């Protein structure tokens, strides 16, 4: 099985190293094509106004000056054009990709691009808690990742579907199983603007997020990782809401 690995945290990110280890537990044909720099939050964007710079940094390892979607396209359409991958793995992201994170995430986008190109694709993320990004428990993803991926492949991934996997903020031995979960919803009032001034007195701004204080819904990815369970969420490329499609169609016919 040929596996193509990418991420959005960049070619030197510890989560990418973790995912390479996971991939090598599944196959001896692992290729890495990842962004040259951190691309967190770029979602499914493409580099349309800048050239893509490709640099080989090791055996089967490439860095692209571009987004995660660019990396998958370069991997499939250029680097591996004569023998395309059987599986795309994107991650392991530094922090969970649950609820609305899915719409912003470059990690999810890497798997999404693979799905668009007709390749089975899985996004993986490692949650962190009060200890912050400096204290991520990468061993959780590293230990449980191969088994979870094998199970997903055994179940099968239908065309047009990608799978979003989130590992909880705990040690491997403290994981309380796997939960197949729906995408949750946060209180987006948590999103704030942090206004500052530079040394010349000019204003600049950072996006900031207040600490979440809400009860996650049952059966959601948010609830799963809060309970130290691995969340597995199938996502559809087709974003059409079928009930609303019917309702709108009826209204426009009236």
Curated annotation (Swiss-Prot):
Where, per UniProt, does this protein localize?
A: Cytoplasm
Q: What does the note accompanying the cofactor annotation read?
A: Binds 1 divalent metal cation per subunit.
Cite the binding residues for a divalent metal cation: 8-9, 40, 93
Protein's UniProt keywords contain tRNA processing: no
The family this protein is said to belong to: Belongs to the SurE nucleotidase family.
Uppermost EC category: hydrolase
Q: Which GO terms describe its molecular function?
A: 3'-nucleotidase activity; 5'-nucleotidase activity; exopolyphosphatase activity; metal ion binding; nucleotide binding
Q: Name one GO cellular component term.
A: cytoplasm
Q: Repeat: is it a keyword of this entry?
A: no
EC annotation from Swiss-Prot or TrEMBL: 3.1.3.5
Which reaction does this chain catalyze?
A: a ribonucleoside 5'-phosphate + H2O = a ribonucleoside + phosphate
From which residue to which does the signal peptide run? none
**Cofactors per UniProt?**
a divalent metal cation
List the PANTHER family hit by this protein, alphabetically.
Answer: 5'-NUCLEOTIDASE SURE, 5'_3'-NUCLEOTIDASE SURE
- InterPro entries registered for this protein in UniProt: SurE, SurE-like_Pase/nucleotidase, SurE-like_sf
Protein name as it appears in the record: 5'-nucleotidase SurE
Q: Which organism is it from?
A: Methylorubrum extorquens (strain PA1) (Methylobacterium extorquens)
NCBIfam families assigned to the protein according to its UniProt record, in alphabetical order: PRK00346.1-4, surE
Q: Which Gene3D superfamilies match?
A: Survival protein SurE-like phosphatase/nucleotidase
Concerning HAMAP family, the annotation shows: SurE
Main localization, broad class: cytoplasm
Give the Pfam families listed for this entry.
Answer: SurE (PF01975)
Job description of the protein: Nucleotidase that shows phosphatase activity on nucleoside 5'-monophosphates.
Q: Which UniProt keywords apply?
A: Cytoplasm, Hydrolase, Metal-binding, Nucleotide-binding
């Amino acid at each position: 099985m040929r596996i193509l690995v990418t991420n959005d945290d960049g070619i030197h990110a510890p989560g990418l190293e973790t995912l390479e280890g996971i991939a090598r537990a599944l196959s001896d044909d692992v290729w890495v094509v990842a962004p040259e720099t951190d691309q967190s939050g770029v979602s499914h964007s493409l580099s349309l106004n800048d050239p893509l710079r490709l640099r080989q940094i090791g055996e089967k390892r490439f860095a692209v000056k571009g987004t995660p979607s660019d990396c998958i396209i370069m991997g499939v359409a250029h680097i591996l054009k004569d023998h395309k991958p059987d599986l795309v793995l994107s991650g392991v992201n530094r922090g969970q990709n649950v609820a609305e994170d899915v719409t912003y995430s470059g990690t999810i986008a890497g798997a999404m691009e693979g799905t668009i190109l007709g390749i089975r694709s899985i996004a993986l993320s490692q949650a962190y808690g009060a200890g912050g990004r400096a204290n991520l428990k990468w061993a959780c993803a590293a230990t449980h990742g191969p088994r979870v991926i094998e199970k997903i492949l055994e179940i099968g991934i239908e065309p047009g579907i990608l799978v979003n996997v989130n590992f909880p903020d705990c040690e491997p031995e403290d994981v309380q199983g796997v939960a197949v979960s729906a995408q949750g919803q946060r209180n987006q009032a948590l999103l704030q603007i942090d206004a500052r001034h530079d040394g010349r007195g000019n204003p600049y701004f950072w996006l900031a997020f207040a600490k979440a204080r809400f009860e996650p819904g049952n059966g959601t990815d948010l609830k799963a990782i809060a309970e130290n369970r691995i969340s597995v969420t199938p996502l559809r490329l087709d974003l059409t809401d079928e009930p609303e499609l019917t309702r709108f169609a009826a209204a426009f016919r009236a």
